[in-house]
Amino acid sequence: MPQLALIRHGQSEWNLQNRFTGWVDVDLTDEGVAQARQSGELLAKAGFEPTHAFVSVLKRAIKTLNFTLEGLDRLWIPVDKSWRLNERHYGALAGLDKNETRAKHGDEQVKIWRRSFDTPPPPVATDHAYHPLNDHRYADVPRELLPASESLKSTLDRVEPYWSSSIQPRLAAGETLIVAAHGNSLRALVKLLFKVSDPDIMEVEVPTGNPLLIDLEDDGITLRSARYLDPVRAKPLPPLPGA
């Protein structure tokens, strides 16, 4: 039976500082490291034995994956890194304090930027340090694919091809997979897996450092069950398709 574990990185420095992060490559806090280690412990207790891992190219997700795999004694499994699993790009909001941004633009506007499906924040300038054109890790990505800002819809548009070409076929082959990524790239995967409507995805949140363990049918698409392994820090999940 295929299994999939989705893990949002542990608490980052900018999570702690309440700043918009996006593609900015900030590190984990000590609490984030502890959450990542706990993820490995929770998955080990659940008997989870991944055969392959996927992760973004941002260090907070990479370190979360490594600490998790260490707890599983599975550091040896193959790991694929892809920019397509990066967090949503927050455009000109990157680095800004969220409370100050609410005070300036209003709660409702900021909620739309953060939680709506198809409204991106204002774009970042192409000469800004936070534009991916100026980051060497994206040197091999076609220029036209690099975002200056993203909505959840555009995040889904870049995540979905990677899911379809690299992740889902392995599930259909019966593998056990782990994906370490970010709040919005994982929301995109949740939308795909649970078939969540555009309006309903606004209310879906993915907590940091709490594995979402999903059991699938042999087709690697149909969900059998899904649960967060730490119920104390769990967020509500959408209903299973067809339930």
Curated annotation (Swiss-Prot):
Residues reported to bind substrate: 8-15, 21-22, 60, 87-90, 98, 114-115, 183-184
SMART domains: PGAM (SM00855)
Pathway: Carbohydrate degradation; glycolysis; pyruvate from D-glyceraldehyde 3-phosphate: step 3/5
Gene Ontology process terms (BP): gluconeogenesis; glycolytic process
UniProt keyword Isomerase, yes or no: yes
Subunit structure: Homodimer.
Record function comment: Catalyzes the interconversion of 2-phosphoglycerate and 3-phosphoglycerate.
Record-given protein name: 2,3-bisphosphoglycerate-dependent phosphoglycerate mutase
Species whose genome carries this gene: Maricaulis maris (strain MCS10) (Caulobacter maris)
Encoding gene, per UniProt annotation: gpmA
